[in-house]
């Protein structure tokens, strides 16, 4: 089983990078994970709605170019479905048991995620109604994946 994480922008803080490396090592016995970064558009101050939509579109097109056909796509979005860690592990298990060999998790940039990606995803998933920095979401996702595979949540 293979998991892709497609994320907008590069990690800038060492503590986040260190955490990502930590969880990638812990996940290695359970699955293959590849993180694909796409370029983040620079957003000017006092962005108009039209400018925001254009930035989301450009980032979104880059994301779409990285999604492999046949992969089960999960977009992380604040308005998505909320589930707990146990249900997340059951969801991962059920997805792979249903015949999918790959899952792709998509994390948008600082402005969020292009609406077209959310519409094309199999699932829009929310980890919380709170807003988290998009770079930190990679670490949070990896931690939840580790919990799912580690057996504490019965995967």
From Swiss-Prot:
Location in the cell: Cytoplasm
Keyword annotations: Cytoplasm, Methyltransferase, rRNA processing, S-adenosyl-L-methionine, Transferase
EC number per UniProt: 2.1.1.177
Top EC group: transferase
Matches recorded under InterPro entries: Alpha/beta_knot_MTases, RlmH-like, tRNA_m1G_MTases_N
Gene Ontology molecular function terms on file: rRNA (pseudouridine-N3-)-methyltransferase activity
HAMAP family referenced in this protein's UniProt entry, alphabetically: 23SrRNA_methyltr_H
Job of this protein: Specifically methylates the pseudouridine at position 1915 (m3Psi1915) in 23S rRNA.
Membership in a protein family: Belongs to the RNA methyltransferase RlmH family.
Designated name of the protein: Ribosomal RNA large subunit methyltransferase H 1
Primary gene name: rlmH1
